[in-house]
Amino acid sequence: MGNLTSTCLFSSRENTAAKINDSSTWYPQQGQHISIQTFRELNRLPTSRRTSTKTEILLYGENSRSTVEVLEEVAKHLTTLQQRR
């Protein structure tokens, strides 16, 4: 397994208690194999139940895309999810 690379984004609106936590973790494998897990958690109110959306992208083999291409797709997917809400 390669080195762990991780990123986390936190955002909140001024006029609401809603908080969005986005985090992505990926493990570059030997031979450019990539595993990416992306999680989004949305808490509407501090006392509300947690609503969680999990997106997982697993790429293996010679036809795998580059790390940059995969990260761009994950960022695009997270942006699309945020716009739908």
UniProtKB/Swiss-Prot annotation:
Q: Write out the PTM section of this UniProt entry.
A: Phosphorylated by Arabidopsis thaliana ASK7/ASK-eta mainly on threonine and serine residues.
The outcome of changing R44P is: Enhanced pathogenicity on N.benthamiana
Which controlled-vocabulary keywords does the entry list? Host cell membrane, Host membrane, Host-virus interaction, Lipoprotein, Membrane, Myristate, Phosphoprotein
Q: Where is the lipid attached (N-myristoyl glycine)?
A: G2
Q: Where in the cell is it found?
A: Host cell membrane
Q: How does it sit in the membrane?
A: Lipid-anchor
Q: Where does it primarily localize?
A: host cell
How does the annotation summarize its subunit structure? Interacts with Arabidopsis thaliana ASK7/ASK-eta and ASK6/ASK-zeta proteins.
Q: Which family does it belong to?
A: Belongs to the geminiviridae protein AC4/C4 family.
UniProt-recorded name of the protein: Protein AC4
In its UniProt entry, the species of origin is given as Tomato golden mosaic virus (strain Yellow vein)
